[in-house]
Amino acid sequence: MSYHLSHILKVAILLFLVPLKISAQSSEVPLADPYVLLYDDIYYAYGTHSNDGIEVYTSDDLVHWKNAGLALHRRNTSQTRWFWAPEVYHIHGKFYMHYSANERLYVAQSDSPLGPFVQLGGPLLQNLLGDTYCIDSTVFVDSDGTVWMFFVRNDDGNCIWQVQLSDDFLTPVPGTLRKCIAVSAPWENIWPRVNEGPSILLHQGTYYLTYSANSYESQDYAVGYATSPNVLGPWEKSSQNPILRRTEGLLGTGHHTFFIDRKGELRIAFHAHSSASAIHPRAMYIGTMEFTHEGHLQLTSQPIVRPKLIAKP
């Protein structure tokens, strides 16, 4: 298998199906929009959960996790609410957290993956877009070293856009902003109009732009992908979509990120509802991905990992 994954710097709606009932488990890792970083042989998980900032969890095996507290506390930011969808990258000896707060994009820096992270500057796209709604950023380094940020902007619903970043991984390059994808497929038309939570893979010369569609509140929140021979698109959505939806009794499966585990396998971290009758809490789950001979991206037959939270002594 040959692929390239850049990690230098990534109300319930019941329609036609009666889902399996899932009991909320206090031992789950309560992260939505999860992101997993492997650093020095330890897994670090970040996500949406706390009103006070961004939590971090650690694990040796992807199954058992410890809550290591707040990696980013709101006192170290200019914002006070809606800390969502963090991704952490190790760059030149520092750790950079891309995240959204109050529906704007920010970057914070730390000397440790555990934090404390401190906000750098103001909203990342303010000079380019002004004070406008932007969430769900992910950073991708192309094979030629060019840095791209994919993110979500509201334009007739949540749509995915991209912009080039300078070598500092922080400064948007003027003239490079472009729209990538928007709601277009029948399976994506369950209220509201959403394409969000982007992530990028490069496999054998093809770029895979993965995303989530439908409301996160819906049991039909799901993951799909689009491909292009060029990082600038145009993007063609796969006929195999959605590739992650209501799997193994899990509902509302979405807002994923990818990472390479210790064995070199391509893994996907995503969230799902813990209950068939409530949106919250959402919890983190981990699957294994593969590319078929035809170039399709799909889940393998390996069971979904259901991370467990180790109680504090």
Model-derived regions, located:
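Sec-dependent signal peptide recognition
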Residues: 4-14, 21
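Carbohydrate-active catalytic/glycan-binding domains of CAZyme proteins
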Residues: 22-313
